[in-house]
Amino acid sequence: MTFLSFLISGISLGSIYAIIALGYTMVYGIAKMLNFAHGDVIMVGAYICFYATSRFELPAIAGVLLAIVVCTILGIVIERLAYKPLRAAPILAVLITAIGVSYFLQNAALLLWSSNPTVFSSVVPEGSVSLFGGQLTIPYVTLVTIAACIVIVLVLVWFTGKTKMGKAMRACSEDKGAAQLMGINVNGTISLTFAIGSGLAAIAGVLLCSAYPTLVPTTGAMPGIKAFTAAVFGGIGSIPGAMLGGVLLGIIEIFAKAYISTQLSDAIVFAVLIVVLVVRPAGLLGKQVREKV
């Protein structure tokens, strides 16, 4: 049962990466921007939930909802102040700005909450499900994380494919100029995309710290990088690709730690990404696009 236990742990970790990667893939798919501050929004969401539930003793669901609301507003503010003025700027300017926003959020967290590790109280009730006569034990937080990822992906696929606003997002991703001529509010659509991505980051932050209950101002940095890797792995711009990339990345990381080396697990994850991109540059589910000159 050890193999199955590692597999489930990998799927759970990968589900967290997938939820974060969905934020990257939606922002890139619609706005064609890489928001490297996304990982730090994860940290903000976790801190908001922690203070809401531990310090102000709000119910867990209220803490999660408050984290989502705060991060959603934060995402809109970041887009309006940092990224909107740079839509016509070179990609290097956008990347430098994203890194600057990331460091700003980390240092603001240091000022507000200090660098001391905080023990995060899980929003998921403690306990586990035993299978095969107790040979396999699955914590509730693992089940909730996997279920949350599946539900979020299904909702996003439905939203982007069936709703008016979702179709507006798809139109903007294809051609912003044509979408604007058709009466679509491009600025509002991009802001909504950042809001959704940041709300997902809050959920991912709460789930991440519920599973690994140590919270510091740099909590979201490495998961953010790995989730970006997952988005590229699966095909950035593709919602199913983000989920597939995240889950595969989580499985690879857990098995690398279990059977190869804990120290080399991150190197193995990024090495697999390089191999995939050499073989299929658009990612596993990404579309190969040829531009005519």
Model-identified regions with their sequence ranges:
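Membrane-embedded helix boundary and interhelical linker motif in transport proteins
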Residues: 8, 30-77, 81, 86, ...
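Residues that define the loop-to-transmembrane-helix transition and helix capping
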Residues: 37, 61-62, 92-93, 164, ...
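Alpha-helical transmembrane segments within multi-pass membrane transporters and channels
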Residues: 24, 57-101, 108, 244-249, ...
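Transmembrane helix-bundle core of multi-pass membrane transporters
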Residues: 85-86, 91-162, 189, 255, ...
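Membrane-interfacial amphipathic/re-entrant helices at transmembrane-helix boundaries
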Residues: 1-20, 48, 60-63, 89-94, ...
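Transmembrane alpha-helical segments in multi-pass inner-membrane proteins
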Residues: 17, 57-69, 191-201, 207-271
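Hydrophobic core segments of alpha-helical transmembrane domains in multi-pass membrane transport
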Residues: 46-50, 68-74, 99-107, 148-157, ...
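Helix-loop-helix "hairpin" substructures at the membrane interface of multi-pass membrane proteins
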Residues: 13-14, 135-215, 239-245
